[in-house]
Structures are given as C-alpha cells and as structure tokens.
C-alpha cells in the first residue's frame, strides 16, 4: 500500500532521489538483526581504556529506571562453532575459565558500584543474565554472583531473566535454577535458545546435546512449577526449510506452554564469517527476501491468531501475560532510552547511560555508551588491573541522541512524536524529513499525526529502516581517520 506523505514532508525530487536509491539497495540485501545492540555499533565507537572511561563517565540520574545486563562469561560448547549461524562472540567452554571469569565479574560489580556515582543500591527494574551460555555457569559461582548483585543493588522489585540452552537448566538436579531462585526478585523468567525442534536441523547446528523436545518440555514444567515464566527463541527461513516445518516448530512451542515466543529470521550470507556462510549448499537454499518476508508474515499471523500479542519486532507474548506485570520487561525497557539507563557487567557488557544533571534544555544533556572487552582473558586482566574493562566508548552528540531515540524505538514498532520531542528537543518530521518520506513511499512506515509506525513490511525490513535513518551520520563517522580528543572514531560498519 502506498502511504502519502503530509505537506510538511515535501522535499525536492533531487533530495529524495539518493535516499530512495539507498533504501532500494538496503531492501535488496540481507536483513540482519542489528537492532538488539543499539546505535552506534561497536565499530563506530572509539577505542577506550579504564582511565579514559573515568574521564568521560557521567554521574547517573537516580530518578531514571535502571536495567542491568550481566554476562557471567562468554563461553559455550556447541559441536559446531557458533551453531553454524551465530555472529556473537563465543569462546570454547572450560569450567576453570568460567569460574575465574565469574570471579572477575563479581569484582567488577563491586568496583564499579563503589566508584560510579548514582549506581550503588539503586532500584533495578530488570536484570538479564546473558552472554555465551549463561546457564552453563557453575551453580555455586552463579550463586555467588547473584549474592553480589543483591548486595550492590535493590533487586526486590526486579524482573530477573536467565538465558541458556535447555539441558543446562536441568543438570545437577536443577542446581542452576536453585541458585537463580535464591536471588531476591519480583519475578523470574527463563529464556531458552531452542532454535528448532527438528532433530535434523539440531544436528546441523551441533545442538543435539542441548536437549530435544522432551528436555524442553521438562524445563517448561519445572519453571512453571517454580512460578517462573518461560520464553523460547525459534528461527525461521533456514536454508530449504519448508513452511510445514516452520509452522510445526511454532505449534510445538505453543503445545509445550511457552509464555513467550521470539521469532528470528536467519541471518546468513556469503562473507558473514559463520560456518554456514562458508557452505555453498546452505547459501543456495536460502529464500530470497520476498519469500522470507512472506514466511515471517505467516509466522506472525499464526501467533496473533492464537492469542499472542506482538510486544516487539521479535517477541510475541500470550495476551493474558502481556497485560500484567509478569510480561517481559527487560526488553521493553531497553528500547526506551529516554527514560531508562542500561548498565552492563561482564565480557562484552554494554552500558548506555545519561548524566544525573538534567537541564531544561535537552540539547545540554549528555549520554555515553561503553562496551567491555569480549575476550575472557583480556577482560579478566583489565578487571584485575583497573576494576573496569572498557574497550570502546562513544559520547553522543545531539544528532546521535536523535538516532539513539529513533533506532531504539523501532523494535517497539512505533516512534512517538511527543516522546521524541520531549527527549531531544526537536521535531521528528524536521530531523528525518527525506528519510521518512522515502520509507512511507516504500510502505515501510505509516506517518500518523501522533507517531511514525512500522507497517508489517517495515517490521521485517526494520534493519533497512534503521540503516537509512542512520546513514548520513554513520558515513561521516566512518570517514574519520584521526580524530581530536573527545571525538569518536570508527572503522567500517554495516549499520547506516
């Protein structure tokens, strides 16, 4: 459907032409899920160190909501590197390395809550244990980490999430669940990386030892018996995967009683660097974007027709759960940077925070993004030496704040105009006029008086939407080779 644009969006044809061409190029390419980490991507961030991080650190505003992302370690143990498809950094699991890394995370929590103003004893709205395979953490080490976090923060009103592979929720008589349940919280939830129930595909992923349908069913029963909610990640558009197989995965997830189902379109293309991206047969069987979009629409319709609510781009929740405070809050809050700070601990931990000084003029507000070392050894060494492990940082300019707001809002399917104005002090239609016009013409967004809303097509191509909005600024950041102190440098990056 063609969506006409209001007069306020009228621009000269020569201004729109390059934007339209850029959008067409993006729509023809692979559609990644780069919205999870948020703007900017790591490659656009300046190389940092703990001493530099202390200089650019800003005190937190204790009136804002706070979420914590805690990565106990970066280790995993699939039989195939990255399960064939995963682009996130993982290292081969070894128990001694995992234990020593968790000890370093504990040290980081203690050091940073002591050193960073506005952090210690803060009320936490949601905490997410992620990383390599978080539930692969030795249970006693996980319990010690949980106790440290409970001492450093007020978790009594928090949602806690624990991510992992199905089988490790059950090993040692559910010891990791016992440790998880020992952390004070308002609500607890498990996030399982199921990917598929198909035994053939699990073998191709090197995930047969992570548990079959029976194991997954047992985890769901155990979690519900403990008062926890449970979500699963499922992938669609696997090479050569039939519609029947995609639908069957969704049917099984509902039969098993999952409270939330997260549906992910496979990211795979030549040159990606994953094991599957080097397999010509896999690449040859990939659906084109049009087919992949049609498959995603069917998956979305299947869940909506069965009483699920689409909470974000990828997360579908049972309607009766979504209407309560037991809905998935961490993701929801992570997509509202105007009101929420996110602080990360552990290898590859990400923090995006704003300062506690809140002038009436939004143009004077400051924000910074920091990313820790991803390698476990480098992370442990940095913590031992400095009590912090910053590898990259990025100080937001006003234009960057605008991009942070719009790109983080996209996963929530809507950019509220009044919220944007209150956050950055300008009008959405003025700041992104040609981009919004091109996106509306392509039926990717609907331009309503109160908000910009993703269409169903825009949901699937949300990565292209974000890239188009960020393109001009990202191009400028890419072009810089030597920057003055206080600026941001970066090498090539795809987002934008």
Which residue stretches match the model-derived regions?
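Conserved phosphate-interacting/catalytic interface
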Residues: 129
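Short amphipathic alpha-helical interaction segments
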Residues: 426-438
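Minor-groove-contacting beta-hairpin "wing" of winged helix-turn-helix DNA-binding domains
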Residues: 451-455
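Short, amphipathic alpha-helical interaction segments positioned at domain boundaries
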Residues: 459-496
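Canonical Radical SAM [4Fe-4S] cluster-binding loop centered on the CxxxCxxC motif
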Residues: 62-104, 203-204, 208
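Flexible, acidic/Gly-rich N-terminal and inter-domain linker regions that tether
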Residues: 1-70, 119-122, 442, 480, ...
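A short, conserved structural fragment
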Residues: 440-450
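C-terminal scaffold of the Radical SAM
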Residues: 95-114, 126, 135-426
